[in-house]
Amino acid sequence: MGDVKVFTGTIVHATDLEPMQILENMAVGVLNNKIVFVEPASELATLKTKYKIQDTREITMTQSQFLMPGLVDTHIHAPQFPNTGIHLVLPLLEWLDNYTFPTEAKFADGKFAQYVYGAAVDRLLRCGTTTATYFGSLHLEGTKILGDTVHARGQRALVGKVNMIANCPSYYQEASLEDSLRETEEFILYIKNLKSDLVLPIVTPRSAPTCPKEHMERLAQLALKHDCHIQSHICESRSENDWVQELFPWSTSYADVYGTVGLLTDKTVMAHGVWLKDEEVALLKESGTGVAHCPNSNLSLRSGLCDVRRLLSAGLKVGLGTDCSGGYSPSILNSLRQAVLMSKTISTMTEGYESITLQEAFRLATLGGAKVICMEDRIGNFEVGKEFDALLVDVATMGTPLDIFPEDTTEEKIEKFLYNGDDRNILQVYVAGRNVMDKTR
């Protein structure tokens, strides 16, 4: 047996039964990239003998530190990263035309792509995002650079080359349907040839308005051929919904368009879902499609208030997304907070409404996201056998937004981090057992 690294102290994670489970005085053993035990620290002497653990492989957490699963961002636009925190003055469709498409068009320049993607992935890792579901741009070479960057940094990710040939600017659209399909398949094979357990391709029609019916059908066939994930947008704003109905008059809904062309699968991630009708929710549930809830973006672009309680009650898989740059923060901690506040806002307008709790939002940010991307057998919490994607958090680090007092309980320290903490409180980031960011060195 190889060397086992052991973390002792407080851990917090989510399970299907408990949205937030806090376990104190625990020992977590990691062999290579997987969790081999989660036991009371009182059993450590026995565990050391059983696993031949050397004292130098033990990391003892202080009373202000805890271990939590890595955060999962189920929806982010990597080429929009330069716009994060600016240009949020227009609603969705006008915002795309005026700010987003011009920025994404710049990624035809490989040097620009390399610089921006390096900054984006580094930022997300510092913010604790161990897994990200990335929209790239429509540029094949530029999106290969995104895949290479993620691979080199050690982040877990789904990476997609955007497909769009209709209803988009002439300076930023693919030449033809055949070119789009050819380059998408080339990109899929390129990512697969990285032979990485962490970086996977994801088929990415930008949205129904930008992809004619045959285009979406053939992208769905490509995904099936290569056993790929799929991602797109759905029911983000009312004006978008109306537009989809005009473009696809034969359909009964936005979700029906995707269902008809074969894009709704159990490996599909649909971003937003703000304006889903009941029959659309049922269709997503039947197909196993997950929803990326992006509350910051939905508020910033005035798209609407997504009723996450409704989606969860219907049995949908739901995770959180930053949707940079529609969302102004690249941190899933921000999405977690905004999700709670959005749900509380809905509760002020709906008698008897049960808003989601901070603990439930924590589960969305970790295990929920893992389920949306069909990786809950590998990541999302600290179950034995799963890969070790984790954050070492310290709520007492100097110069952070947190104030900790002697009477604070462990639960209160964790709540303070979730509501007020930031990347300065995250000391170490692990992906598949590898330390990819370390502030303790």
Question: Which residues fall in each region the model found?
Answer:
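N-terminal metal-binding scaffold of metallo-dependent hydrolase/deaminase domains
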Residues: 1-54, 59, 65
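C-terminal cap of metal-dependent C-N hydrolases
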Residues: 16, 387-441
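Alpha-helical scaffold segments that flank or form the walls of functional sites
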Residues: 66, 84-155, 180-196
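Active-site gating loops and adjacent loop-to-helix segments of metal-dependent hydrolytic enzymes
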Residues: 82-113, 166-177, 237-267, 287-290, ...
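Metal-coordinating catalytic core of metallo-dependent amide/deamination hydrolases
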Residues: 141-273
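Glycine-enriched alpha-helix->loop->beta-strand junction motifs that scaffold or abut catalytic
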Residues: 154-156, 220-229, 263-266, 283-292, ...
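His/Asp/Glu-enriched, well-ordered alpha-helical/loop segment
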Residues: 260-267, 309-402
